[in-house]
Amino acid sequence: LGDVYKRQDQYLLILGARLQGPKTRQTGRTVKFTSKDLKNWKFEGDFWAPDLYTMHEMPDLFKIGDWWYHIVTEYSDRSKMVYRMSKSLEGPWIAPKDDAFDGRAYYAGRTFELNGQRILFGWVATKDQDDDDNNFIWAGTFMAHEVYQREDGTLGVRIPETVWNAFDKEEKTEDFVIDTPTKSTEKVVAKDTGDIFKFEADVEFTEGTRTFGVRFYEDEDKAESYQFIFNVTEDRYVFEKKPNWPWPANQNIGLERPLELVPGKKYNIKMIVDDTIATIYVDGVALNARAYKRPGESLSLFASEGSLKVTNCKVTTGLKK
């Protein structure tokens, strides 16, 4: 699939392609055609040919301000949506430090503009047999990110306002601190979340803190849950089952995102859980995941070997009618 764009007196068509040859060769590329009448097309060669992937899927192209953005879904074991940026359609196409919009579970999206907002619609993939242990398979549930431009020209994503405002019963928790210098400690902030809710909090951690994060669908008695865990020393966050036992309790390869984690900096966390889909946003960095087993209905925050300050903590359950 490709896209058509009007450029001055002609149209530009981009398509995902690869070179003829063995499928093991990573010759994926985006190619271009031009036309003046939408009937007769001239092949113009490569639009972007990085030789990084086996194939380019779902190529997309749009402009915000001075920057052009070219999106493809990488046909690889990671199956991520990635982008490059340029101030010219002739390139060069620059790779930002974080070139993705989401993780392994978000795939084959396209963008459109609605009321001045750039909306990215992609698939949150299902897992084979609806089982946490199994691999992701094609298709699933459509899910929208709003794409926005940062000051440096790179792209972030956030929850579309209409989605965030669709929830009903909000409960706010008093600000608190988890001070746990020698072990891991959690604080439960909601006990009966149900299977559709949103969560928001601002968090700050101190120097030396090893990990912190959010747990949901938690059974407090069994200490079993799903969690988004922020590994401070690794500058990334990961979705996983807790405990990951019997090994592995969840196939989570690719369910992680890079995020620079700085002591004393305030991070805004927003999360939506809708049945088996969990989506988290942290300062413009998003991650989708699937959670099928649902051990319980508690929601908690945790930290290990350090201190975590939590403010603006809110849980909202159900949808407005």
Segments the model singles out, each with a brief description of its role:
Residues 1-5:
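Short, small-residue-biased leader/transition segments that mark boundaries at the very start
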Residues 22-31, 78-84, 130-134, 143:
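Structural motif
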Residues 31-52, 83-102, 153, 157-160:
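Blade-edge beta-strand/turn elements of extracellular beta-propeller
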Residues 61, 199-201, 265-280:
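Short tryptophan-centered beta-strand motifs in secreted/extracellular beta-sheet-rich domains
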Residues 179-244:
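Secretory/extracellular carbohydrate-interaction modules
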Residues 245-268:
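Short, aromatic/His-centered strand-loop micro-motif at the edge of beta-sheets
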Residues 284-300:
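Short, solvent-exposed beta-strand-to-loop segments that form ligand-recognition rims
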Residues 295-321:
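Ligand-recognition surfaces built from glycine- and aromatic
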